[in-house]
Amino acid sequence: MLSSQTSTIFTVSRLNQTVRLLLEQEMGQVWISGEISNFTQPASGHWYFTLKDDTAQVRCAMFRNSNRRVTFRPQHGQQVLVRANITLYEPRGDYQIIIESMQPAGEGLLQQKYELLKAKLQAEGLFDQQYKQPLPSPAHCVGVITSKTGAALHDILHVLKRRDPSLPVIIYPTAVQGDDAPGQIVRAIERANARNECDVLIVGRGGGSLEDLWSFNDERVARAIFASRIPVVSAVGHETDVTIADFVADLRAPTPSAAAEIVSRNQQELLRQIQSAQQRLGMAMDYYLANRNRRFTQLFHRLQQQHPQLRLARQQTMLERLRQRMNFALDNQLKRAASRQQRVLQRLNQQNPQPRIYRAQTRIQQLEYRLAENVRARLSATRERFGNAVTHLEAVSPLSTLARGYSVTTATDGKVLKQTRQVKAGDVLTTRLSDGWVESEVKGVTTAKKTRRKKTD
């Protein structure tokens, strides 16, 4: 008879179902490391095998839709790391795991460490864009932290020599693989910052497996790159290789060669820019000289128009025109007087009264005398005005000033000297005298002291 304390009676099916649900709901997904044994792959494409260690084993299944993502062929005795769900095969009551992903054990553990460190540093803000330093443009000296025997160094130097042979390069050799590599890389970064010889650093190496590149996933290296005052370009492996150093660095280059391309200037492009600048400068200079030459020609013509000899010639021409006009006016007056006289004589001859003739002759003589006197007076006044004009013109003429012993001195630029500050020792001067020019060289300049007038009470 059943005990009254027994509350539930399970069937075998229900028991297995309950256990399966407990395993799946309570345990969820787990990571398991172990050795493969009894590996089989039937026609269905599923994988069945056992994972074991020194003291225990568990049945495993990996269905076709999951195992097609595995990049290697599992082998008997191979250590692997799997992500799986725990379950129970109800018909037989066998406890087993259903695997979702599989990696070789070493690489899988490294990947876990990588993800954990990445999450940690990202949470601390080491990947934030606000901390990224701009690269110098152009760089005046490049530091390279890598193996002195690796292909990466050869690629970097080859690109720098091709693009910018004059760019100085300082190599900080260090191991890039092995247990000692992270410490050496950190010391190389610190040494480059302490010496402060370059303004940009390339930190990297050539391609390899995750284990080969692991030095650049080291937390010490990441923090050294973040603390560097010199901008750092990471150049680790190939374009598909992404390390913690890439996230922390100020800029990530897909390859070492690409890093060299980024930090260097293209010499051919610089040469083209210089040639273009020279061409623009030449065109600007030609335009400037043409403008100055045109301005000089204009000033020269204006100076010629204001030359004393030309002004005197214009005044002489004006006086000649006045003289001609005066002579023409006198001739016209004389002709008109003679014409009037002739008309009067004709009228007298027609009337022929003797007294009137005598009176007319007397009147004519008086008129002739008055006319002659008037003409002589006007001619004398005109001549006097003409003489005064000539005297005035001669008085204001620069040539008259020169004839009185004065001179006019001009500098090499053609400007008339008025003050001593316009010349200096060694300048060549041109002095205009009344009868020619004298060229002289300044031996010295002495400025006369100005005397101040005393104020009177």
Curated annotation (Swiss-Prot):
Function text: Bidirectionally degrades single-stranded DNA into large acid-insoluble oligonucleotides, which are then degraded further into small acid-soluble oligonucleotides.
Q: Which family does it belong to?
A: Belongs to the XseA family.
Q: Which residues form the signal peptide?
A: none
Q: Show the catalytic activity.
A: Exonucleolytic cleavage in either 5'- to 3'- or 3'- to 5'-direction to yield nucleoside 5'-phosphates
Record carries keyword Hydrolase? yes
Question: Where does this one sit in the cell?
Answer: Cytoplasm
Q: Which Pfam families match?
A: Exonuc_VII_L, tRNA_anti_2
Query: Which Gene Ontology CC terms are recorded?
Result: cytoplasm; exodeoxyribonuclease VII complex
Which BP terms does GO give this entry? DNA catabolic process
Known EC number(s)? 3.1.11.6
Q: Recall the GO molecular function terms of this protein's record.
A: exodeoxyribonuclease VII activity; nucleic acid binding
Source species of the chain: Citrobacter koseri (strain ATCC BAA-895 / CDC 4225-83 / SGSC4696)
Q: What is this protein called?
A: Exodeoxyribonuclease 7 large subunit
* Name of the gene: xseA
